[in-house]
């Protein structure tokens, strides 16, 4: 059985890890980096770039370069968070037929799971290149506060990328696994994982206990905001730069997509620099032009200015921390360790606020970029049976229930319930002789159903006529270890039953997923063909070069007819290499190899002759050298002594 890899599919960056024995290993990608930007670019010729190559060309191709797509995964187009992003993103966010938020690139509509699958495919390939074997299974992380639709969509992305997703695991829980596994403190420890990434924020309170030599990680509570992260911090800086430039130059850059892409890069760079220095300079020559000529942007920014711009965003993370502490039934003083995860936690002001709230310094021995992928890899080794000393008890982040009479949300499973879990409750009809009931499933904390997220609905039909309140309909909720919900309804009188896995009344249908899997496989096939063609062209170029060189040196030893034959074969191979037919190139490579066989024999004979001459000269030289050797030795000795004397 192959390894189960751990993937941190991040909003801004992604990371892949495995366990080698008991040691976690974060794998470098083909560019030599341990994290990969979650950026995907669709080129004019149909090529898809992922990671650093996509990021490098973003400035010149902003409409077809997708980033922060995780913010759209499993979301409806009409959701206010999505509507907010529409005005900020240089690429086009559109409404799919099922009401989901999709993106439009080069005249084709793409579902967010389809786009995220490109990043997952790169992670899969990174692991395969390192392991030297195919990888088919993975544990993928999601923000703890992701709802059912978002988890389902992430699982779909894995399938489209050709991965069997063995488990969806919460990011803070994964970080806790990475942190707690090698710690040998005895007794129970309560830790708070504060995870502020590129697009999402999570806080989890987790208890690590030693139970008969087994490490037990129990999530006591979780909270967060799935639309708050580094991208929002960048946006505050971008808005500030736009405002300053407008005041200074009278030009509004917010409508210029090329300028916006450059501003995004500059904002991210300034934010990172201000974590280690007090001031930075944002310098963007030729940012735009008007009738008076080109305009340059030059702006100094201090750490204090940045902190004032994002203060409200940092403060927004504290309320979920309060709720999580309360839900866990602990006091702030009970927390033994605070772990920071996600790139944004490198910001000194964030660290300061966390210290202020928890009353203690956060641990510095956790890598905020890699801990989540490492934790996912550890969970992978637990699932494959390689590790038997770890038990993970996670929770569902939000309450789940159904709509009952009067539009009330009747909770079936309350938030922070340990998963997997099951719950059943008996309901009845609201009208006399009602032949069917519609079960509407919601997720959220509001008292009225409409204030929560509708995950899906289904009917139970064929209920025998009876006065209202008489039929007994048992509704059962079952959450699996991925946090994905399965719901059933059964008429106790007739035994009639209907079960569904909540796929939301949006999400991707099985047919769509299968089509995307096929597209992805076709893409992989195209990539393979393109690679084979490139290899064939390289081989052709190398052969042409070496043959030409040999003709220049030894051509005078060939008969005129042989030389012409070689020249003709070179010309034919050059023509074939310019085309796109690999079979044709291979055939012409063979033809040139055959045509230049005589030439090869001449080269070989000449090399043999030269080697013979060198051998004779070498033997004579060796004798002379042996005679001179003792003197050489003395010279070297004297040199060493001289150096030692100086010391």
Swiss-Prot record:
SUPFAM superfamilies: Actin-like ATPase domain, Heat shock protein 70kD (HSP70), C-terminal subdomain, Heat shock protein 70kD (HSP70), peptide-binding domain. Keywords: ATP-binding, Chaperone, Nucleotide-binding, Phosphoprotein, Stress response. The modification Phosphothreonine is found at residue 200. One of its GO terms (molecular function) is ATP binding. Residues 611-647 are annotated as: Disordered. It comes from the Bacteria. Induction: By stress conditions e.g. heat shock. PANTHER family: HEAT SHOCK PROTEIN 70KDA. This is Chaperone protein DnaK. It comes from Cupriavidus taiwanensis (strain DSM 17343 / BCRC 17206 / CCUG 44338 / CIP 107171 / LMG 19424 / R1) (Ralstonia taiwanensis (strain LMG 19424)). The lineage of its organism: Bacteria, Pseudomonadati, Pseudomonadota, Betaproteobacteria, Burkholderiales.
């Amino acid at each position: 059985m192959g390894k189960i890899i751990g993937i941190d599919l991040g909003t801004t960056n992604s990371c892949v890890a495995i366990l080698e024995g008991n040691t976690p290993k974060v794998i470098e990608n083909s560019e030599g980096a341990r994290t990969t930007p979650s950026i995907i670019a669709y080129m004019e010729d149909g090529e898809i770039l992922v990671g650093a190559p996509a990021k490098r060309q973003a400035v010149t191709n902003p409409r077809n370069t997708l980033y922060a797509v995780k913010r759209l995964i499993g979301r409806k187009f009409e959701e206010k968070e999505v509507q907010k992003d529409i005005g900020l993103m240089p690429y086009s966010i559109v409404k799919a037929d099922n009401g989901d938020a999709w993106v439009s690139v080069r005249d084709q509509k793409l579902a967010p799971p389809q786009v995220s699958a490109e990043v997952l495919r790169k992670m899969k390939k990174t692991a395969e290149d390192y392991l030297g074997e195919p990888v088919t299974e993975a544990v993928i992380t999601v923000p703890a506060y992701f709802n059912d639709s978002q988890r389902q969509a992430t699982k779909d992305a894995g399938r489209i990328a050709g991965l069997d997703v063995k488990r969806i695991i919460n990011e803070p829980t994964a970080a806790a696994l990475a942190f707690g596994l090698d710690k040998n403190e005895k007794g129970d420890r309560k830790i708070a994982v504060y995870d502020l990434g590129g697009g999402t924020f999570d806080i989890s309170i987790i208890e690590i206990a030693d139970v008969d030599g087994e490490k037990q990680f129990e999530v006591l509570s979780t909270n967060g905001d799935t639309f708050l992260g580094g991208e929002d911090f960048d946006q505050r800086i971008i808005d500030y730069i736009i405002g300053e430039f407008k005041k200074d130059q009278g030009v509004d850059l917010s409508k210029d997509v090329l300028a916006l892409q450059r501003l995004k890069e500059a904002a991210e760079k300034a934010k990172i620099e201000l974590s280690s220095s007090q001031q930075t300079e944002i310098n963007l020559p030729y940012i735009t032009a008007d009738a008076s000529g080109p305009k340059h942007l030059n702006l100094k920014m201090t750490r204090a200015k940045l902190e004032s711009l994002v203060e409200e965003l940092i403060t927004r993370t504290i309320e979920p921390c309060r709720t999580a502490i309360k839900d866990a039934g602990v006091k702030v003083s009970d927390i033994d360790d605070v772990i920071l995860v996600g790139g944004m936690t490198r910001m000194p002001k964030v660290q300061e606020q966390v210290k202020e709230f928890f009353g203690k310094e956060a641990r510095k021995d956790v890598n905020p970029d890699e801990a989540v992928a490492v934790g996912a890899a550890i969970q992978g080794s637990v699932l494959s049976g390689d590790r038997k000393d770890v038990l993970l008890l996670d929770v569902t982040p939000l309450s789940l229930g159904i709509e009952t009479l009067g539009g009330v949300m009747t909770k079936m499973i309350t938030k922070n319930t340990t998963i997997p879990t099951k719950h059943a409750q008996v309901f009845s009809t609201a009208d006399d002789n009602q032949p069917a009931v519609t079960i509407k499933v919601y997720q959220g904390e509001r008292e009225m159903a409409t204030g929560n997220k509708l995950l899906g609905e289904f009917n139970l039909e064929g209920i025998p006529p009876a006065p209202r309140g008489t039929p007994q309909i048992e509704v059962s909720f079952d959450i699996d270890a991925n946090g994905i919900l399965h719901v059933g309804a059964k008429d106790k009188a007739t035994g009639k039953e209907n079960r569904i896995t909540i796929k939301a009344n949006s999400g991707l249908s099985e047919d769509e997923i299968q089509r995307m899997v096929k597209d992805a496989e076709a893409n992989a096939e195209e990539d393979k063909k393109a690679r084979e063609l490139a290899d064939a062209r390289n081989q052709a170029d190398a052969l042409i070069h070496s043959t030409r060189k040999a003709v220049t040196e030894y051509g005078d030893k060939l008969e005129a007819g042989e030389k012409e034959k070689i020249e003709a074969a070179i010309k034919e191979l050059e023509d074939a290499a310019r085309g796109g037919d690999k079979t044709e190139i291979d055939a012409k490579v063979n033809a040139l190899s055959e045509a230049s066989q005589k030439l090869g024999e001449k080269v070989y004979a000449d090399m043999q002759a030269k080697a013979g001459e060198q051998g004779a000269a070498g033997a004579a030289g060796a004798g002379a050298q042996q005679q001179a050797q003792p003197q050489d030795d003395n010279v070297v000795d004297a040199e060493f002594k001289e150096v030692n004397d100086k010391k």
